[in-house]
């Protein structure tokens, strides 16, 4: 199943759906909205994750220009979707906008998602 993320338009809760049985996801008494990830980025700050695999480690950065990591504008989290499952890492203002994930032998990257607090979800 392709990874899907949903956001509540009232409180801002974000969830990742693990299994889809067709029942709407509800928060604050209303259905949550699916977040459709961007895949190309024409803005000055690059958001699309760029990943490489070296010796079983997935290295993730964001575009050709380093993304700001300020309290008002930063990458909140990164999610790695592989053939065997998912991993997620949180980032905080002031940190370098890079993460690494361990990849088990035989596993393969299917997608990498990054969530910017201002510009929403991005996918590579």
Indicate where each model-derived feature is located.
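Residues immediately within or flanking Cys/His clusters that coordinate Zn2+
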Residues: 5, 24, 113
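Cys/His-rich microdomains that often coordinate metals
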Residues: 15, 31-32, 120
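Cysteine-rich micro-motifs
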Residues: 21-32
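Short acidic/polar inter-strand loop motif in beta-rich domains
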Residues: 117-124
């Amino acid at each position: 199943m392709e990874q899907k993320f949903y956001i509540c338009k009232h409180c801002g809760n974000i969830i990742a759906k693990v299994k889809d049985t067709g029942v709407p996801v509800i928060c604050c008494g209303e259905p949550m909205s699916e977040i459709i990830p961007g895949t190309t980025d024409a803005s000055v700050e690059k958001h699309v994750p760029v990943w490489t695999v070296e010796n079983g480690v997935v290295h993730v950065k964001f575009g050709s220009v380093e993304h700001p990591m300020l309290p008002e504008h930063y990458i909140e989290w990164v999610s790695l979707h592989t053939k065997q499952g998912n991993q997620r890492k949180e980032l905080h203002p002031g940190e370098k906008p890079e993460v690494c994930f361990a990849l088990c032998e035989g596993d393969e990257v299917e997608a990498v998602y990054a969530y910017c607090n201002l510009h929403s979800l991005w996918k590579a």
